[in-house]
Curated annotation (Swiss-Prot):
Probably homomultimerizes. Component of the MTV complex, composed of moi/modigliani, tea and ver/verrocchio. Interacts with moi/modigliani and tea (via C-terminus); the interactions are direct and require fully intact moi/modigliani and ver/verrocchio. The MTV complex is recruited to telomeres by the HipHop-HOAP complex, consisting of HipHop, cav/HOAP and Su(var)205/HP1 to form the terminin telomere-capping complex. Interacts with cav/HOAP; the interaction is direct. Interacts with Su(var)205/HP1; the interaction is indirect and probably requires cav/HOAP or moi/modigliani. The keyword Nucleus applies. Multiple telomeric fusions result in multicentric linear chromosomes that resemble little trains of chromosomes, hence the name 'verrocchio', the name of an Italian train named after the artist. This is Protein verrocchio. It comes from Drosophila melanogaster (Fruit fly). The gene is ver.
Length: 214
């Protein structure tokens, strides 16, 4: 660490790390057979039509001309209503214009308690001039962290990024989400950006499949 940096500089770097933390590899190649991908951008209609790989229960296959084998996916959708919540999950009905399904989002209560405890400690330090600057910065970072782990903040009308995997229960396809991000912006920039990313990713996959099959 550069000791000439201000607390604001350090906070900016930490905030940047939280937002741009390394994600899992986008794809992994098995010993044989098709490539199995992680974090694939998909539409809800693709998830609804996906089937489980009979040779690997952790892998799903899209029902496309150029099928995608994947373990985890990313979607962007609008919250249209609540499902039936339980002790472990918050459940929401989501729609992206191509289809709708129920998404289950893990509550992660332990992480929430840890962050709340740290926030209380930082808040008590903020009353001291010696620690006020770094304590206030830490409080802001902890507040941002809660936005990524507390699904109770989600409500009807929110737009979400969700990372998870399909789950078929009683004949209906749903999504088990491990991570979420609430798009609180008033513009549609993030939605449009996701559509562009999805289109580009699937175009590259199609090109790769055509090249492989030649």
């Amino acid at each position: 660490m550069d000791f000439n940096q201000s607390f604001e500089d350090i906070e900016s770097q930490l905030d940047n790390f939280v937002i741009r933390k390394n994600q899992q590899s986008e794809k992994s190649t098995g010993k044989c057979g098709p490539e199995v991908h992680d974090n694939v951008p998909l539409t809800i209609s693709q998830i609804e039509r996906a089937t489980q790989d009979p040779e690997n229960e952790n892998v799903f296959i899209t029902d496309d001309v150029h099928p995608i084998h994947f373990c985890t996916c990313i979607i962007y959708a609008f919250v249209t209503g609540n499902g039936t919540h339980n002790e472990s999950f918050m459940k929401f009905m989501i729609d992206d214009g191509t289809g709708s399904l129920e998404a289950s989002i893990t509550k992660k209560p332990f992480n929430g308690r840890v962050i709340s405890s740290l926030y209380s400690e930082a808040s008590s330090l903020a009353s001291s001039e010696a620690y006020k600057s770094i304590a206030v910065s830490m409080m802001r970072l902890l507040q941002v962290s809660m936005e990524y782990i507390d699904p109770t903040r989600i409500s009807r009308g929110h737009s979400l990024f969700l990372r998870g995997r399909p789950n078929r229960f009683r004949g209906k396809m749903g999504l088990d989400a491990f991570q979420f991000f609430i798009d609180s912006g008033r513009s549609r920039n993030m939605e449009i950006g996701f559509v562009d990313y999805l289109t580009d990713w699937q175009r590259r996959h199609k090109t790769m499949q055509n090249t492989t099959n030649k």
